[in-house]
Amino acid sequence: MTNAIQNRYDFVLLFDVKDGNPNGDPDAGNLPRIDPETGHGLVTDVCIKRKVRNYAQLVKNGAERYDIYVKEKAVLGRAHEEAFRELGIQLGEEYKGHTTKDVYEGLEELGVPPGITIDCDEDANTYILTVAADADKKEIKEWLKENKPVKGIKDVINEALKQAKTRKPSAEEVEQGRGKMCDKYYDIRTFGGVLSLKSAPNCGQVRGPVQLTFSRSVDQVVPLEHSITRMAVATEAEAEKQSGDNRTMGRKFTVPYALYRCHGFISAPLAGQTGFGEDDLNLFWDALCNMFEHDHSAARGQMATRKLIVFKHDSQLGNVPAHKLFELVSINRVQNSDKPARDFSDYEVKFDSAKVPAGVTAEIRI
């Protein structure tokens, strides 16, 4: 794409947290993420990408070419269908039909053929079999031959196929859909995405030009657990049980202080495939610098971007391995400091700008 960036970039991002939980782990009761072998704190790349998306959505407010694909409460399949409609590509029609509990349980045990989903509402005692608009009927029939389900299941699926008016996009149409999604959604153009949903028109896969590592704390962290009290209860039953005391106990997890380091990479060749241009790049830098200013919450405490050092290569493929550039940025504790770090001033960030190789320019953006 002609307006795409023409240079490779690598960057170092430093951010910190004070008395907050920068990225809770849902598999560990929302405790701050930690490397169990070293005790260093972790923040996932997905967490940072979420904040970039939120910032872009806030600043651009859904402007043309700057909508966000993965946003809160989004139904992703709708975006695919909308893209195909805007391209004037005819789609099939999704089919939904009621079925029985026996069919539901049978397919749950056997597995569901590609292009078909089955859902249940146990409260309403209803079971819905859905054939996707782009389901491949031939592929489903092959599945029936290979898996040989019982007659009741086979009959239900065959009847659904008769009723369904499916149409699978051609390879050329899939590529058109992919291009439309890249053009319309900033986060797809930036980070890429898997756009081959089972329940929506296939838009292929996109490798994003911008990629991030996990962020790792400079020093080990010790998460703290705090008891908190709410001076109210949710139900009358709780109030009666507490004889009117009406208190609810809870837990809150924080990191007293941690400075995190993240590395990032921006590929010019991949930017050419998605149309990631200079305006997109500038928005990305702005997001990294300001994302925490619009993401405050009681759980996250005080977070801030402390440093963003950008290395720009004078070629698309780059002139120096990224790790050699990252080694120019070092972080050390200030001298004569034997107490745990509790502020950014407890660290000294050094950047050896004199050793930046030829063919690379460095910029300290914050």
Predicted segments with their positions:
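Basic polyanion-binding and macromolecular-assembly surfaces
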Residues: 1-46, 50-366
